[in-house]
Regions:
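Glycine-rich phosphate/diphosphate-binding loop of Rossmann-like nucleotide-binding domains
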Residues: 74, 79-99, 157, 165-263
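ADP-ribose/adenylate-binding Rossmann-like module
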Residues: 131-134, 155, 257-311
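Short, acidic/small-residue loops that bind anionic groups at enzyme active sites
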Residues: 150-164, 283-286
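Adenosine-phosphate binding glycine-rich loop
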Residues: 158, 180, 283-393
Length: 409
């Protein structure tokens, strides 16, 4: 049976990948009186007096909405809300399997920025966090920024930040392998969409100053008159200080790091050969990378990562988002801020001991059960230290709870 046939059969047999199950039984009058009338009035009254108690008495404290408009779904593009639901269901399965979080898929029948923002704001009372998913750039930037300002729960566009966090964790370790200083490296990033912009911002936060971002028109620089948008304009102000113009082939020369979030075969072996010694290549285009790892290695690359599970160093968002939201929910965070993102980077990177670190093992595997608990612990701690936590908890308790909640063996 082909992958297509197997996938279709699995989805049809189960009528999707999710179901709703109660946490309590209702098998007699006493249980009915507690779950519904008259007993249900008691938590209602308590929540009315203190809205924070909604986290204690309802699913809000362990539930995240997975929201899309279906405009930028995986490698499929703008396929609309209905066709995006299987992906949102899949994301919800990962939330539950890796961190015990209830993920609720919501596919919106609008691509209007204001309507999306208004709808998500109206949903805020129900959810402990919002995971934005597969919303096209540059609209995704405004939607996330507005929602972060106008809501009081964590809003996280995983296509941006999940990718950036795992990429950064991999880069931290790859630089240890090649023994290069992050403040002195030259990075060329190909792809100026949601993931690329977020990666550049996180690289800057980690001290990388020599960066050139490319899109389909070549190097982005301040004052470029073509193919720009407000987000690219901002990035251009603090990247490519020398205003280098030209194609990817021209600007990748002497680079220490290539990061691709673009299209298959964008990077050639000759381009790799033109880079600095011991180059690091993260080729994350899906389903096919910018360069095949074996080809990159043959051209001189020292460390190669992709988005695929059939090659070493898989840069997979599942290493980040379950633990990030678990940590945020445990402290009832109001936001996911930069300190929490950095804490997630360090949690992922630190899981690989120096004695284990090598060219083919710079990033933990997606089924390493230590990942989500470690990320959750670090994120909860960072939330408390940075002032966005509503409650104080012991970070080690967060680790232990997440370890018990994960389905991984």
């Amino acid at each position: 049976m082909s992958l297509r046939d197997e996938a279709l059969e699995m989805h049809k047999r189960n009528q999707g990948k999710l179901e709703v199950k109660p946490n309590v039984e209702v098998t007699n009058k006493e249980e009915l009186s507690l779950a519904y009338s008259p007993g249900v009035a008691e938590p209602c009254k308590d929540i009315y007096e203190d809205k924070r108690k909604v986290y204690d008495y309802t699913i809000k404290g362990n539930t995240v909405a997975v929201i899309t408009d279906g405009t930028a779904v995986l490698g499929l593009g703008n396929i609309g809300p209905e066709a995006s639901i299987p992906v949102m269901e899949g994301k919800a399965v990962l939330f539950k399997s890796f961190a015990g979080i209830n993920g609720v898929p919501i596919a919106l029948n609008t691509t209007d920025t204001e309507e999306i923002i208004k709808t998500v704001k109206l949903l805020e009372p129900n959810y402990g966090g919002i995971n934005l998913e597969d919303i096209s750039a540059p609209r995704c930037f405004e939607i996330e920024e507005r929602l972060k300002k106008e809501t009081n729960i964590p809003v996280f566009h995983d296509d941006q930040h999940g990718t950036a966090i795992v990429t950064m964790a991999g880069l931290v370790n790859a630089l240890r392998v090649v023994n290069k200083d992050i403040a002195k490296i030259k990075v060329v990033l190909n792809g100026a969409g949601a993931a690329g912009i977020a990666i550049v911002k996180l690289l800057y936060a980690y001290g990388v100053r020599n960066m050139v971002m490319c899109d389909s028109r070549g190097a982005i620089f301040e004052g470029r008159s073509y193919g720009m948008n407000p987000t690219k304009d901002v990035v251009a102000k603090w990247t490519n200080k020398d205003k280098i113009e030209g194609s990817l082939e021209e600007v990748v020369k002497d680079a220490d790091v290539f990061i691709g979030v673009s299209v298959a075969n964008a990077l050639s072996q000759d381009m790799v050969k033109s880079m600095a010694d011991n180059p690091i290549i993260f080729a994350m285009a899906n389903p096919n990378p910018e360069i095949i790892p074996d080809d990159a290695k043959a051209a001189g690359a020292r460390v190669v990562g992709t988005g695929r599970s059939d090659y070493p160093n898989q840069i997979n968002n599942v290493l980040a988002f379950p633990g990030i939201f678990r940590g945020a929910l445990e402290v009832e965070a109001t936001h996911i801020n930069e300190e929490m993102k950095k804490a997630a980077v360090e949690a992922i990177a630190d899981l690989i001991d120096s004695s284990e670190l090598n060219e083919d093992y710079c990033i933990p595997g997606p089924f390493d059960k230590r990942v989500a608990p470690s990320v959750a612990r670090n994120v909860a701690k960072a939330a408390m230290e940075s002032g966005v936590a509503r409650i104080e908890v012991d970070p080690q308790d967060v680790y232990d709870k997440t370890m018990k909640l994960t389905d991984l063996q």
